[in-house]
Amino acid sequence: MTILNPITFPVILESLLASNDLTEEQSNYLMNSWLDNKIEPVQTGAFLAAFRAKGVSGDELSAMAKILQDASTTPSDLPSFDLVDTCGTGGDGANTFNISTGVAFVSAALGVKIAKHGNRSASGKVGSADVLENLGLPLNVSSGKVVEALKKLGITFLFAPSWHPSLVNLAPLRKSLGVRTIFNLLGPLVNPLRPKSQVLGVAKADLLDPMSVALKGMGLKRAVVVHGAGGLDEASLAGANQFRFLDKDVIRSEIISPGDLGLTQISNESLKGDGLKTNSHILKSLLNGEGNQYHKEVIALNTALVLWVSGTEDDLSSGVKRALDCLDTDKSWLLFEQLRDFLAT
């Protein structure tokens, strides 16, 4: 009887097509082959389609994310303090304003060290990089400058394409496929500054478990994975939000509605953006202590998650209150201006 080598492209593809999860060794081999440009485009298309059909496991994600993170441009002088990232997988199609970007600056204004890892638009009309660039933040800056900003100001922004040069060769094929792939899930997991805590939004409820398992596998101290009411990849004001809380290697599930935290329940329509100009105006207004109440409340809800994962607050209710108080001031906008000016020099 012939025993097939389990670490070959055909065997790996057959395993995926049979809806079997890959071993860690297979996952590592596949990701390293992508990074070394050893997979033909037609094979890559087949693998990405097979993952999409099977559904990805948390162990597959963590194995591949570790390889991808190690291949990123990682500075030698990483900060000694713990960092938090705030991001979502995208794909909700809701076209909300840039909630997680606002959350990053409000959280930093409240003392949390934020390493925001982001890109241009994935599913919405405007990505975090798009809106920040439109407000004057330089994107293509040296890794040293990015880290220096974090140490000086307590917040920085990492423009994903600048930090993951090994993925450039895959970009045209991913775009030509026209569907979301495993790389859309890996992106939020591979912050090169290696935060120890994270708030991560998913657009589909069936991603809650694999993404939380992946974060655990990558050694995070604390994390929140959230699927928002109405299908948002953020905590929403529209109703019951589904959560996975990771704390000390234990993952627990919870459902929290805005009313549980004294917030208004309102449809996601109230959170919609409308292109780059409008989204930029909304974000600037909020950070400047202005903006409408519903926008402030959804920022406060998601900021409370950041305050919890960072250990700044023990409960979400107190985190919401602190965030709302901050949103009545211009502290967050002043911090944005400091970061913008620092990165521009």
Curated annotation (Swiss-Prot):
GO biological process, one term: L-tryptophan biosynthetic process
Names of the cofactor(s): Mg(2+)
Residues noted as binding Mg(2+) 2 in the record, renumbered to the chain: 233-234
Residues holding anthranilate 2: 174
GO cellular component terms, semicolon-separated: cytosol
Cofactor note: Binds 2 magnesium ions per monomer.
Entry GO MF terms: anthranilate phosphoribosyltransferase activity; magnesium ion binding
Catalytic activity: N-(5-phospho-beta-D-ribosyl)anthranilate + diphosphate = 5-phospho-alpha-D-ribose 1-diphosphate + anthranilate
Classification via Gene3D superfamilies: Nucleoside phosphorylase/phosphoribosyltransferase catalytic domain, Transferase, Pyrimidine Nucleoside Phosphorylase, Chain C
Signal peptide: none
InterPro entries reported for this sequence: Anthranilate_Pribosyl_Tfrase (IPR005940), Glycosyl_Trfase_fam3 (IPR000312), Glycosyl_Trfase_fam3_N_dom (IPR017459), Glycosyl_Trfase_fam3_N_dom_sf (IPR036320), Nuc_phospho_transferase (IPR035902)
Annotated binding of anthranilate 1, by residue: 88, 119
Binding site for 5-phospho-alpha-D-ribose 1-diphosphate: 88, 91-92, 96, 98-101, 116-124, 128
List of residues binding Mg(2+) 1: 100, 234
Top EC category: transferase
EC number of this enzyme: 2.4.2.18
Pathway in which this enzyme or protein is active: Amino-acid biosynthesis; L-tryptophan biosynthesis; L-tryptophan from chorismate: step 2/5
Family to which the UniProt record says this protein belongs: Belongs to the anthranilate phosphoribosyltransferase family.
SUBUNIT field: Homodimer.
The protein's role, per its UniProt record: Catalyzes the transfer of the phosphoribosyl group of 5-phosphorylribose-1-pyrophosphate (PRPP) to anthranilate to yield N-(5'-phosphoribosyl)-anthranilate (PRA).
Protein name: Anthranilate phosphoribosyltransferase
